[in-house]
């Protein structure tokens, strides 16, 4: 008789864990949706990749440079967007001691084709630990509508 409540409790616990696991996985993704656009992004040290938006020599010698890479998808069709212009404004972590490194930097993300896939990217300075806010202004070719998307990147050393 005592084992029946234990089995029910165990089943309830398994159901609870099963419901919470997908939410935790979604929190770790680097994907943001806004309007008609889904944005997938990644940030990696520039020394580990070919440099876009800068020379390879600069990327390999400067440990503070990171490469922001963005892939755009049309939410209604799921197809990759290949004809966009993206301007990014990167704001560094806030500092109470100094505002030197919090000055926003604006950059135009450059399109790069790898096979059939188009991504957009640029190098930026991420020398301080903390959360970087990256504001994207996305315009598709032939459209005047600008889609604004905010990405958050938590720089940890």
What are these regions (language model features)?
Residues 1-5:
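Positively charged n-region of N-terminal signal peptides that target proteins for export
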Residues 72-76, 92:
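Short solvent-exposed capping/turn motifs at the termini of beta-strands
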């Amino acid at each position: 008789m005592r084992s029946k409540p234990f089995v029910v409790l165990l089943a309830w616990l398994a159901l609870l864990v099963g419901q919470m696991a997908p939410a935790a996985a979604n929190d770790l993704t680097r994907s943001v949706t806004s309007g008609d656009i889904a944005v997938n992004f990644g940030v990696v040290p520039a020394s580990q990749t070919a440099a876009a938006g800068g020379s390879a020599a600069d990327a390999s010698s400067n440990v503070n440079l990171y490469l922001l890479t963005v892939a755009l998808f049309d939410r209604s069709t799921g197809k990759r967007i290949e004809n966009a212009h993206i301007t990014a404004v990167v704001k560094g972590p806030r500092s109470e001691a100094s505002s030197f490194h919090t000055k926003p930097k604006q950059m135009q993300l450059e399109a790069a084709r790898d096979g059939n896939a188009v991504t957009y990217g640029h190098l930026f300075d991420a020398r301080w630990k903390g959360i970087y806010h990256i504001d994207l202004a996305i315009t598709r070719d032939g459209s005047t509508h600008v889609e604004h998307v905010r990405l958050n990147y938590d720089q940890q050393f």
